[in-house]
A protein has these predicted regions:
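Active-site anion-handling motifs in enzyme catalytic cores
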Residues: 1-356
Length: 356
C-alpha cells in the first residue's frame, strides 16, 4: 500500500525526527511504501498572538498556551536536514486538500506518532488536518501511537465536537498512553488500542547500523534534556561522582548545536554507562540500548507518557524522587526485553491487521 503519514516533525527535535524515521522503516519492513506530508506554511505571528490572548481571556490562566511554531527559516541544523533527506521520504504541503490523495496515489493515511492530537501543538487548521478532515471516505484512515501529550483534556468544546466527528471516520485508532485510551473513550466515544511508540518497534541493531561510522566513545554519563536545568544536572552530578565518570550533555530544541547529528545522538546511548534524562525519547533509547537510567519528571505535569511505558515494562523505579536521588535500580534487562517483545508484537499486529 502507499501510505501518507501526518506527524509532528520538528527539525530541531531528535525525537520528532526519529519517530518518523522509525515508522517509515517499520512500514517498509511490512511491505508498504510511505511518504510523510510536511506542513510548508508558517502560521502567522498575528494569528498566533490573537489565539494566545483569546486563550488567556477564556481560561483566565497562562497554562497550556499555544506553542509558537517553528518557522521554515529557523529550523534545524544542516546535519539534521541531511539526515531527513537521506532517511525520510517527505513532501512539503501548503494546504491539505482532498486532491492530495489522488495526486500521490495514497491508499491509506496514518496519523502519528508523537503529540499529534495536542491542540497547543496544532494551531489553526492543523488540528483538523491531524484528524484527516481533508481525506474522503474512500481512503483508509488510522492513527498509530497518537498522543494528546497529557492526561488532562485540553480541547475546547468546539474542538471536541469537531474532532470527535472526524475521529469516528477512522478505520482504527491506536494511542501511545493508557490515559489516551480513556480520553478517546470519554470524549470521542471511541475504543482505542494502546501501542508502543514507533521507535520501540525497531531494535538496537537497527539503530546501531545508523551510527556504525561513529567511533566508540569513552564511558560517560549521558545527559539528554529538553531544557537542561538544575534538577537534571543535580542528578547527573551525583551519578558522575559515584561512578567517577565525565558528563556529556545534549539538549533538545533551540539548544541543538550546529555540529550535532542524529547519528552521534544514537552513539551517545550506545556508549554511555548511565543516562539521565527528562525526555520521553531519551527514556525510550535508554531502554532500547539497555542502559541504566534516571528519568526526571516535569513538575508542571505531562508525565503520563513516561509513566505509561515504565509501568508496562516494570521500570517505575527509574523515576527520580523528590529528593533528586538517582535511580540505583538493578534492571533485569532480560525480563524488560521479554515484556517489550510482547508489546512490540501486539503493536505490529495493529499495523498488519489495519493496513491490508
Amino acid at each position: 500500500m502507499k501510505i501518507g503519514i501526518l506527524t509532528q516533525h520538528f527539525l530541531l527535535n531528535y525525537g520528532g525526527i526519529i519517530q518518523n524515521f522509525a515508522l517509515q522503516q517499520v512500514l517498509l519492513k511490512l511491505g508498504h511504501d510511505s511518504l510523510t506530508f510536511e506542513h510548508d506554511t508558517c502560521y502567522s505571528r498575528t494569528r498566533w498572538f490573537l489565539r494566545t490572548i483569546k486563550h488567556i481571556l477564556r481560561t483566565r490562566s497562562f497554562r497550556n498556551l499555544p506553542v509558537y511554531p517553528i518557522y521554515k527559516g529557523r529550523i534545524g541544523n544542516k546535519n539534521f536536514i541531511k539526515f531527513v533527506l537521506r532517511n525520510i521520504r517527505s513532501v512539503p504541503v501548503k494546504d491539505f486538500v482532498p486532491s492530495l490523495t489522488a495526486q500521490y496515489g495514497i491508499d491509506a493515511y496514518v496519523v502519528g506518532s508523537d503529540q499529534v492530537w495536542r491542540p497547543a501543538f496544532n494551531l489553526g487548521p492543523r488540528l483538523g488536518n491531524m484528524f484527516l478532515d481533508f481525506a474522503d471516505d474512500k481512503v483508509k484512515k488510522l492513527s498509530y501511537a497518537a498522543s494528546f501529550g497529557c492526561k488532562k483534556w485540553e480541547y475546547t468544546k468546539e474542538q471536541e465536537k469537531a474532532c470527535s466527528k472526524l475521529a469516528r471516520r477512522f478505520d482504527a485508532i491506536s494511542v501511545r498512553e493508557a490515559s489516551a485510551v480513556d480520553l478517546c473513550k470519554n470524549h470521542f466515544g471511541i475504543d482505542a488500542t494502546l501501542v508502543l511508540d514507533p521507535t520501540l518497534l525497531l531494535n538496537k541493531e537497527d539503530y546501531e547500523k545508523v551510527c556504525n561510522n561513529i567511533p566508540k566513545k569513552e564511558n560517560h554519563i549521558f545527559v539528554y534534556s529538553l531544557v537542561v536545568g538544575e534538577s537534571v544536572m543535580n542528578v547527573a552530578s551525583k551519578v558522575s561522582e559515584a561512578k567517577g565518570l565525565p558528563i556529556v550533555v545534549k539538549e533538545a530544541g533551540g539548544k541543538v548545536k550546529k555540529e550535532d547529528t542524529i547519528e552521534d545522538w544514537f552513539a551517545e546511548f550506545r556508549d554511555a554507562e548511565y543516562v539521565v534524562t527528562d525526555s520521553f525519547h531519551g527514556m525510550v533509547f535508554s531502554i532500547i540500548f539497555n542502559k541504566p537510567f534516571s528519568i526526571v519528571m516535569n513538575p508542571s505535569g505531562g508525565n503520563d507518557r513516561y509513566i505509561s511505558l515504565l509501568s508496562q515494562l516494570g521500570l517505575t523505579e527509574c523515576i527520580v524522587d523528590e529528593k533528586l536521588t538517582p535511580s540505583s535500580a538493578i534492571i533485569d534487562w532480560e525480563q524488560v526485553c521479554s515484556r517489550l517483545n510482547v508489546l512490540r508484537e501486539s503493536s505490529l499486529l495493529f499495523l498488519k491487521q489495519n493496513l491490508r
